[in-house]
Amino acid sequence: MFNWKSKCSTRSLLTTVAGAKSDDSEFESVDAPLEPQTWEGSFLCGLLKNQPQVLPVAAAKQLQELSTQRKDTLIRWEHSIGSPEDILHRRIAEMKEQECQTAIEDIMYTLIVYKFFKIEVPLVPNLSKLISNRRLQIWPPRETELESIHGPEVLGLIREHLTSIIRWVHRNGPKINCSTLRIKRLQFSRIYSASIMYGYFLKSVTTRHRLELILAQSQEFCPPIQFLNAQFNSTQKQEQEEAIGGSTEISSSSKPSSVVDLHDLKSYMMGFDPKTLELCARLRSCEASNLIEKHSWALFRENMKDFLEPDEAVILDPSSLKRLLLEAIAFGSFLWDVEDYVDEIYKLHDS
């Protein structure tokens, strides 16, 4: 349903290569792993296919309409409290809330897919469509495009994450050869979901870091009121001591504090206390949590049979694993942006 239209011609949004070997693989057009469940999602899918340039405006309008519908329903319920229609309007409000949440999640997912569209990277579809004889290969890797959305410091952290994951799979999986990995399907899905969370976490950290740098720079030119008060009290004390012939030395505690040290991102992150670390890692909304679960489920499991066979192993090369992990990290970063944008228009549920 989520299809892609390039600048020059109409193409499938999701074009991947599946097969045991790159030379006998063939391209195929497939849908995104998660299909829309609401009219709003289906409508945006059509725009993404035929008129992607108008999708952001259409999504914003849908968000406004859903916000208005939810408010109107709640107002009718509040007005009916104490009347015979109280229970009816409460039930209507609950149903409307559920409908709106599903529609909001569809809109958020489409906006994430649109962000992948803008960097010309197709989302990997359900892996069952790409696996042949338990072997998965994804080509091209799209490494350059997926890395292009991150700054140099973040990219360094991401590469450390990728290296640690690949080494872990090598160390814990059955030994085949140095260029082939084998991982259980359930483990694979957990690593993918964890990488989405890592991308979300990195986006949260970089945003917080940037804001603190701006604050530190502003304080350098415009000292905070606490510092000005300390300066004033220090001056008063000095004048009093001079008036009675006392010492004119200013205590070290009253001297101007040094400007906040502008750490690099990794040093800044390593300095987090447990509370700050938890705050940055925690998903802000239930909708974001639901999307990660739904997207991962749609990618790794086609039906209940797949879920009941978690020990099924997947064979793949390091480049295919790296492709999926980079996609997951980008998904988490895009999710943070989309969640922040949507929450400004339609208040999401706190997680």
Language-model features, listed with the residues they occupy:
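Long compositionally biased, domain-poor regions of proteins
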Residues: 21-351
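N-terminal chloroplast transit peptides
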Residues: 1-24
